[in-house]
């Protein structure tokens, strides 16, 4: 569910949103839906922290066991994307963090006073190649959705939780685009957006 749809559902249901929680790039404890101007679908700050105090960021292997395996002709592309999603997410995270910091970002469980991202792939969806070829206006886009948490390597304390989805290949494209590549590009965008979150901490 996209953030705007989620907010609309809350209003219809008569549920309240904590003051200051919607559309804010906050770094204090609380849940932000979305975080920023749709920059990240959902961020929960569990504990305030200072990014500069940490030696770097490590990314544990993503849990892909909960992601649908794909169907029909696209099953092979989904499996290929699942096999490469760690690298794409890491690439995006490096891009996001390097835009403001020289902190090292590397795969692994992390050690010392570093941040560790432990993520789960909720969905890698190939979208519709036919719709990408002929319809346009965002139709048929492939997408990736991830959820996870950021913890301290040395203490195991959870500092932040996130859920985010990105799309790639929307609109008309020649041949509809390769769905595997588009799913991986979506995962890269998720990583990049998350990497930029640390800038406000």
Language-model regions, residue ranges each:
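Bacterial N-terminal signal peptides that target proteins for export
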Residues: 1-9
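Bacterial N-terminal signal peptides
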Residues: 8-16
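A structural "domain/chain start" motif
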Residues: 20-91, 196-201
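Surface-exposed short loop/turn segments
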Residues: 23-33, 100-157, 168-177
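Short, small-residue-rich loop/turn micro-motifs
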Residues: 61-66, 123, 162-168
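Generic domain-boundary/flexible-linker signal
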Residues: 68-70, 130, 159
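Short secondary-structure boundary motifs at beta->alpha junctions and helix caps
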Residues: 74-80, 139, 145, 151-200
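Sec-exported extracytoplasmic/periplasmic mature domains
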Residues: 90, 94-102, 126, 167, ...
């Amino acid at each position: 569910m996209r953030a705007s749809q989620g907010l609309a559902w809350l209003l219809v249901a008569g549920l309240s949103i904590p003051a200051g929680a919607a559309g804010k790039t906050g770094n204090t404890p609380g849940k932000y839906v979305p975080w920023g101007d749709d920059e990240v679908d959902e961020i929960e700050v569990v504990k305030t922290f200072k990014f500069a105090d940490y030696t770097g960021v490590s990314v544990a292997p993503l849990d892909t066991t909960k992601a649908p395996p794909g169907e029909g002709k696209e099953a092979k592309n989904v499996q290929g994307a699942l096999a490469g999603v760690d690298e794409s997410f890491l690439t995006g995270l490096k891009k996001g963090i390097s835009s403001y910091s020289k902190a090292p970002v590397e795969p692994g469980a992390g050690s010392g006073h570093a941040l560790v991202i432990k993520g789960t792939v909720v969905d890698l969806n190939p979208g519709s190649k036919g719709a990408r070829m002929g319809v346009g206006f965002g139709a048929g886009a492939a997408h990736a959705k991830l959820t996870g948490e950021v913890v301290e390597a040395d203490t195991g304390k959870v500092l932040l939780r996130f859920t985010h989805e990105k799309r790639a290949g929307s609109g008309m494209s020649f041949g509809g685009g390769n769905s595997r590549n588009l799913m991986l590009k979506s995962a890269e965008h998720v990583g990049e957006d998350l990497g930029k979150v640390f800038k406000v901490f």
